[in-house]
């Protein structure tokens, strides 16, 4: 009650923020005559002057009115488009590092130019992040005209560019690109061997377009760079054959709400018999069990033409939020291979993670982050908790005129689709354009078939027909036009109403099913009623829809019975609509917890990732790695000598063991023969440094490159192995909950211990390699072409040719021979991994 009264008297927090910006808007408007008097050639000169002022210490906030007024005038001259006052407010919200919620058609692309130009004055670069390559190229070319008019440079990052092109794009004042490309470039930079090979130049300021899609919808999917592993693909086919013989509810159960499939006791016994093993859950059968469960999920939780399609003999993922195809992106953990076996297409080798990061942790690296979207308010809590971003609702330039009708709810899908087809036919006959939103390719094609039978001409826009996306969406507002679009395909392209359509009521949005997120529903509605245009929307639902069936059916079914529904008769009751909205809120809360849990686990990895990447950057850029090598050596010798320094005289066995480790790790027998007594730690240190000194004498100026090569080589090898071990730890850590232990704390504790061990293995590995080098002829170029990992998940990079390897003193070790380090493991599973 008190909160309501406070809001009534003082306005909401959002209202108070916008009110504070009004005097600045007035100041910008007051500068308009001054900017109108400038000649075209004066604009780049002004920008150069502002840049100089920033270098001299003037704050961006003090310059905001002048710069915004200059950009507004530039917009008028280049595009004949003047920024509205509400767009100035949106620009200020972005500059302040907030999320600007602006309705469809309010000109988000133009709004971004204001803070982009202001922040580009620092010379540290501004990144504008979009959801796909098409929008990145379109906006860079379109808004690039304005930036070039002002004397600012523009780059664009899209799939297929080489490192030189990427470096040039990042070197520009303003860089457009997709979230995937920015994230992968960061990971790839941290796999490079020379500082001059890096393409990114830091993370200063980013504006994320469609911020809800990128920071929330895609936050459950980490970016992963991977290389092929050695596992055979035959096992996937075998497990697929077994799963086809299982019977639901007898051999396994499926929980669609939790998206899990589990074997029953009878199913376990049946599978053990078919595979020919005694115990499926024996540690020795963990690989078989894993592939069996993935095959079970592939057959029972993933649907063709909903979660993926088969195109040109490949399984291609369909983005559940946008309906777009995601070529090059693969499900991890063997699931994609299980789907390939299910669809009887070629099975690609499973990949091993070489580098990964979540979008949450990538975007939190920016000194300042802002975002734009038409729908963010429903996720304001998550934006604040995860990213410390506030959502500001920007008023529309003209009042909203769209009418949102109550949901029409039917008992069965058949009744619902019949009603939809009839409604479309009536609207088409009246000449009112209709945009039909579906949540799967399957539904869009079913409706298309129904409309063909009734003779209603229409366009279909889904992942199978995405080539003409912009063209189809642009025509969607024409008189009598019917467009069926999967989810939010076509976001970013305005639907302009054709002649005479306003008089007919504008564009009508027809939703065929509620999405599990209210925000996605609001995005679909938001395609109508842009810039004060008339419009309308209605969702058609049935009790058989996934959301109703899984999350709200019992209560809603009870309401239906009380209201006495008959076949084919819809119900339009606010009570039912509220029950559906509550079901959506439950799903949103569930998904938020999933994303938060992912972040909690990735925060552990993020701390480790930062340490490793800092080590790599130091190794790449340090003019002299000598002090680092001495520090590594001290740590190694401290560990080697620990058994012999307990206070008492070491036994003969202890002395032999220490000599053995000195020989293995430091190759000390190259300059010192084993004796009954151990050398002091200082003597051992001097001996190892003498080996390195000899290497420096033999290699001259190439010494630093050789040290760096082996340091980065060992670091990458150990980090790759550590990522795999952390994946395995994460997979099994949930079981700790049964032992009354917090899985997250256990993961953090054990992960830290594993990380400490890995750091030590890096130090050992560097000395094991360097002390065995015998130089015949070392060319610096041999170290400048370090082989990059072959397969890049999501982005598909190609491998470069590898270098000629330096000659070693030891005889060549076969991959299946015992490792010479003395671990007792095969070379390919140990130092040769």
UniProtKB/Swiss-Prot annotation:
Amino-acid positions noted as binding Zn(2+) in the UniProt annotation, renumbered to this chain: 819, 821, 830-831
Membrane topology recorded in Swiss-Prot or TrEMBL: Peripheral membrane protein
Signal peptide: none
Cofactor: how and how many bound: May bind 1 zinc ion per subunit.
Enzyme Commission number: 7.4.2.8
A Pfam family per the record: P-loop_SecA
Residues forming coiled coils: none
Compartments it resides in: Cell inner membrane; Cytoplasm
Stretches with biased composition (Basic and acidic residues): 806-815
Binding site for ATP: 87, 105-109, 494
Primary residence: membrane
GO molecular function, one term: protein-exporting ATPase activity
Record keywords, A-Z: ATP-binding, Cell inner membrane, Cell membrane, Cytoplasm, Membrane, Metal-binding, Nucleotide-binding, Protein transport, Translocase, Translocation, Transport, Zinc
Disulfide-bond pairs as recorded: none
PROSITE patterns, alphabetized: SECA, SECA_MOTOR_DEAD
Annotated InterPro entries: Helicase_ATP-bd, Helicase_C-like, P-loop_NTPase, SEC_C_motif, SecA, SecA_CS, SecA_DEAD, SecA_motor_DEAD
Family: Belongs to the SecA family.
Record text on subunit structure and interactions: Monomer and homodimer. Part of the essential Sec protein translocation apparatus which comprises SecA, SecYEG and auxiliary proteins SecDF-YajC and YidC.
Protein name as it appears in the record: Protein translocase subunit SecA
Species lineage: Bacteria, Pseudomonadati, Thermodesulfobacteriota, Desulfovibrionia, Desulfovibrionales
